[in-house]
Amino acid sequence: MKFLDQAKVYIRSGNGGSGAVSFRREKFIEFGGPDGGNGGRGGDVWALVVDGLNTLIDYRYQQHFKAKTGGHGKGRNMTGEKGGDVILKVPVGTQIFEEDNTTLICDLTEVGQRYRLAKGGNGGFGNLHFTTSTNRAPRRANPGLAGEERAIWLRLKLIADAGLVGLPNAGKSTFLSSVTAAKPKVADYPFTTLHPHLGVVRIDGREFVLADIPGLIEGAHEGVGIGDRFLGHVERCRVLLHLISAQEEDVAKAYQIVRHELEAYGNNLSDKTEIVALSQIDTLTIEERKMKQKALRRVTDQPVMMFSAVSREGLENVLRAGAHIIEMSRKEEMGGDSRID
């Protein structure tokens, strides 16, 4: 499935139906009074969060959405039916912005959540509404009110518990495919991953969602490369898994480049809990591993884990560390006891 995380769409709610001019006509009643009904309200435009979606690709092919006009009023004081609504189905984590792509309208984070983006126009009054003591047979009715029209932006921020970050070829895609059922493209060249991938990790009876974010390079926050566009997807993550390839000559510099990009991007990304791990250690000798681990520890000031997605050495330790942090975060969010036995 192709991935699209941003789309501009044009929406319009339905016009209200017109009121009716009608008079009661029955046998033996020569002068029936007015009985024109009101017009129905126009249809609304809604955004609805549905399960099973993780892209906005449908909005690449259709950008214009218009709800139905309300039904016209009829005789016998019959109100026109309401116009049909239009529902924009979106994935969990979709944010909706005004046309300026800056002003937030709503943030949709739960399946079943919905938001009315445009309200249908009210129906017009039928002639029955205009009856007065001095005008018992009005021949006047109102047209319905026009619906609302606006352009909006849909922007998807994937909701994952953990986000994989690192330079291109840090082994993120290999890691994801090794620990989940996700099948991202894996190859020996930079920028293999061109859009985020999600996978579910299961370990020790626990599970969490892991996102593979396209590799960052120096200057990404200024638009260099492709990773800066997707940093928004890790804003909701509870923990960042920062991978540094053991094949990097200067692992400390590789770590610092990504940290700088996270800090420059802002939105508190650099404040998130981080697990630092040296990947692809199957390519190193025991002595080389220790040297690079020590070099990383000096700049990170925290423990540095090591693993190989190929040999699976150290892999479960990394997953358990991530699952532990995520579980603590979930308990804190629920206001429960954050201790884990």
Swiss-Prot record:
GTP binds at residues 166-173, 191-195, 212-215, 279-282, 308-310. Mg(2+) binds at S173, T193. Its EC number is 3.6.5.-. Residues 1-159 form the Obg domain. It is found in: Cytoplasm. One of its GO terms (molecular function) is magnesium ion binding. Residues 160-327 form the OBG-type G domain. One of its GO terms (cellular component) is cytoplasm. The keyword Endoplasmic reticulum does not apply. Its cofactor is Mg(2+). GO terms for biological process: ribosome biogenesis. InterPro entries: G_OBG (IPR031167), GTP-bd (IPR006073), GTP-bd_Obg/CgtA (IPR014100), GTP1-OBG_CS (IPR006074), GTP1_OBG_dom (IPR006169), GTP1_OBG_dom_sf (IPR036726), OBG_GTPase (IPR045086), P-loop_NTPase (IPR027417). Keywords: Cytoplasm, GTP-binding, Hydrolase, Magnesium, Metal-binding, Nucleotide-binding. Monomer. Belongs to the TRAFAC class OBG-HflX-like GTPase superfamily. OBG GTPase family. This is GTPase Obg.
